Amino acid sequence: APQQINDIVHRTITPLIEQQKIPGMAVAVIYQGKPYYFTWGYADIAKKQPVTQQTLFELGSVSKTFTGVLGGDAIARGEIKLSDPTTKYWPELTAKQWNGITLLHLATYTAGGLPLQVPDEVKSSSDLLRFYQNWQPAWAPGTQRLYANSSIGLFGALAVKPSGLSFEQAMQTRVFQPLKLNHTWINVPPAEEKNYAWGYREGKAVHVSPGALDAKAYGVKSTIEDMARWVQSNLKPLDINEKTLQQGIQLAQSRYWQTGDMYQGLGWEMLDWPVNPDSIINGSDNKIALAARPVKAITPPTPAVRASWVHKTGATGGFGSYVAFIPEKELGIVMLANKNYPNPARVDAAWQILNALQ
């Protein structure tokens, strides 16, 4: 990598790894549209397996950016509309609180207080229906944002229904394969398991447990190389041959709601560039990120703004990820680690690096 990139990355990430006691880490910087890769530490401590550019990390909620783009692609194909009622795609959802709740509300956490997690006891599809039928909203749809796997997870499940494909098939054929993300998985195949890092939680090696709607909300695993490609695709959608995918990426970066200086997209979250670093760093803290916040609807939604800081945090029990990019600058970063360490430390490091390179 050019000296300047090398220097700022090592100056920023080495102390982060020490402070946060991160066993293994992979970072990609996209500079003038090109990726530069850096790796540290171990994917498997017991086997002394180093992190490489082929190591698979759990993305956690960065998975939501794939779900948002897949939903955008379904919109571009004319299969769904964000303004459609949820019940159009799930007629069994007859409880009256679902009147007026649209796919947009599900995709953007604004249905009225769907919970962060789908309860663990929800296993079967009948359990899932019962859970949503019995849920009681705290607010009218489109008034408050409460970040929720149970919200965007249901959006992902319903968005693929008209295609007749399973969620995994739709994601593979419509997003992963066209973008040549050939080492990005919802279910890691046996041949790839040798590359699958262990996550570390309180010193114990862990992998994410299965759960209802997990694929849509937090289930993707990927390598630093594929994630750099993902950022490149989101930075420059016009370079993508598949027209519906190109539109889907643009729809995912459109601005549907505003809360404070943050705009909610489909999976992605945006702030105007230049950005106030305190705002992105503090805003990523779970105390703020997971709190209910009033939203202002943007009607019609603002199309993707190139002068934006576009980002998403993600975690599972043993992994912590972060992706941020600035389309106008052709600049971006991916940070993958096999420890779930605090969001503000991730965003702060990303800001230091991208701000130095802009």
For each of these PLM feature ranges, what is it?
Residues 1-38, 160, 165, 169-173, ...:
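Catalytic loop of the DD-peptidase/beta-lactamase superfamily, centered on the K-T-G motif
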Residues 4, 8-15, 61, 66, ...:
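Extracytoplasmic/secreted proteins, especially bacterial periplasmic and envelope-associated proteins
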Residues 5, 9, 55, 82, ...:
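Residue-level signature of the cytosolic catalytic core of signaling kinases
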Residues 18-26, 46-106, 137-151, 215-218, ...:
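Short active-site loop at a secondary-structure junction
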Residues 36, 47-49, 115-117, 277-278:
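Short, solvent-exposed loop/turn elements at domain surfaces
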Residues 38-40, 116-121, 186-190, 345-347:
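Short, solvent-exposed loop/turn and secondary-structure capping segments
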Residues 46, 126-138, 199-213, 300-307:
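The feature captures the short pre-catalytic strand/loop hairpin that immediately precedes
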Residues 58-62, 74-114, 118, 134-136, ...:
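Active-site helix/loop module of the DD-peptidase/beta-lactamase fold
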